[in-house]
C-alpha cells in the first residue's frame, strides 16, 4: 500500500485522540450532572447520552469490528440512560474506549484497508469502518460542544489574540 494508506490511519488516530476527545474534555469540564444530562425534550439527546453513544459506537465499530473483541453494545441503552453519571466518569469511560480503539487502529496494516468487514448489518472495508467512526465522532462532538456552550458560554477552545485562531485544548495543533 502507499504512503496515503498510512497517512489515512495516522490522521484518523490524530482526529479521534488529539482533536475531538480533548475538545469534549474541555467543553464538559466543570459542567454539573444536571447540565450533562439536560435534554431539550424527550426526543433530544443530552451530553451524557451522546458520550455514551460515542463510547458504544467506537467500541462496536473499531474495538469489536476491526479488533475482534466481543460486541457487547446495547445501542438503545446509550439513549435511554438517565442515571446522571458525573461528567468526569463519563469522560474517563469515553477516553478509555478511544485510547483502546487508537491501539487497534495503530496496529492495522495499511495493506488491509480494503479488506471486507461486516459491522452491525453493514458490509464495508476496514477503511470505511474507520472513516465512519471518525465522521460520526466529529458530528456528535459538535453537538456536545453546542450543548456545553449553552451552559458555559464561550468554551475558549481557541486563542484569538494573534488574529489567527490557535487551539487551546490539549493536543490541539491543526489550523481552522
Q: Which stretches of residues belong to each language-model region?
A:
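Extreme N-terminus of proteins, especially the signal/transit-peptide cleavage junction
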Residues: 1-7
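Short, contiguous alpha-helical
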Residues: 2, 13-28, 33-78, 119-176
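Short Lys/Arg-rich basic patches
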Residues: 8-12
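Acidic/histidine-rich alpha-helical segments that form the ligand environment
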Residues: 82-118, 125-139
